[in-house]
Amino acid sequence: KRKSYAPAFAPTFAFRIYLLILALLFHLLAVGAVSLDNGDFGDRYYYRTEFSATEATKRFGVITDMRLDMHVTLFGERASDDGPSGGETVNPFESTTDPAATTAPADTSDTTEATTEPPAPIEYGDNVMDIDFAALAEKETNKDIKAAHEYFGSLTPTKKNAYTGMFKGKNLIFMTLEGFSYKTIDKDRTPILYKMATEGFVFNNYYNSLWGGSTATGEYTTMTGLFHNSAKCLEMSAKDNMYFAMGNQLSRIGYKTYAFHNHYYTYYGRDKSHPNFGYEFIAINHGLEGLTDCWPRSDYEMAVATLPYYINLKQPWHAYYMTVSGHANYSFMGNNMSKRHKDVVENLTCSDNVKAYHACQYEVELMLEELVRQLDEAGELENTVFVMNADHYPYALTDSELAELYGIPEAGIHKNFDLLRNGLILWSASMTEPVVVDKPCSAIDIIPTLSNLFGLEYDSRLFAGVDILSDTMPLVILNQDGDGSAWNWINAYGEYHSATKTFTPYPGFEASDEEIAAYVKPMNGVVQRKN
């Protein structure tokens, strides 16, 4: 006997219109709900003021993310007053210790006569250029550019200091290290890295934000002193005047400037960005030859292949490197460098994937060993400054593996700021003793700090970061993944987590809830305006 079925429902045209109206009403209701949230860096901020693909997807869903992305692509960012408010920041924290202090080498000079009068403080000038922002703002008709002139003109510049020009005229090797963590530095296994990390400038509270969650955004921040949350930021920067990128700054005063990368020339649009940063850019498929064809390629082999470009130059030089050996995957099957150096890490007491991570990062040690050896033989080691920073933490490791590597709890690991701690290496063989810096600082502070150390003419108001060695307190801005928070921040007084909207003062700093709230609101405005 044949079964009978009810006829399929055939929606009428009127019914389809009814569904469409319901969908539109639901969308308007959702948009209205977003508008009710006007907390600092809340849903309203990411819907109306700043577009972030990561935040939009988490907060509003894929379809709304695509719509907002298309709007920004076609028309640019939307101007809005929905961000955190500005106003004067009233600091409620009092301490007898200057939180901006830098621990400098002790003065060992002899004195022949005691004095009752303290020495007069040295008056250093500001790191500024002759830019009249008020005049520029007065003449400007474009409201966005006018607002930018007014903003930069309102900033207090950083001052020159005892370290200004310390490395003037020296060569510079500047590296962005793929997926690097300071946890892989070991006195016995990586002696060159250890020496550089402990005998130069020692930054005890250095952080690497995720920015846009990619190598491109981490590299952009390292190279510019600015930050961006789009993986297309390098390519997009090619149309901008990157006047203060180190390649441009140093080439203007007679340096020969190279940038090297042991991956493809066009990847992330570096073929467009890096020449605009002031470099002759050499990479795979564009001049970089002699490397083993494998994944990932060897950082050590890149050093061997590129040293001849600059080591015998009669003029000062600057070599920038973007490494790739530390790239995921972190396994002995999925990473050629991990497999190559498996014997170096076989005695480590950790899981295989964490061992593989340490093994591939061993390439950085071998690269530095080769650079130091050849520079020493050429008589240029003491005339060369090394600077190294990671693009991001090794986020391809699982949460349990990250907890193992960093020694922090797995639960809530992406809300833990210690996951973003890292090491900034700034070293020269000419330094006779380390300089310890306890201030919180981050990648946006590297270029201003180097500009001051090399005695370059720059305007400190035009960076998102500051010279770490100045008397200005850096503001660490942290973007994390996986917890719905974007612009967290840290300074000498405590840390703010945007997901919970809480500021936690560090020991020794106390204030009432009302004072903290009055402090946090304008500080969030500072963070928003730097973005």
Where in the sequence are the language-model features?
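N-terminal secretory/membrane-targeting segments
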Residues: 1-170, 186-190
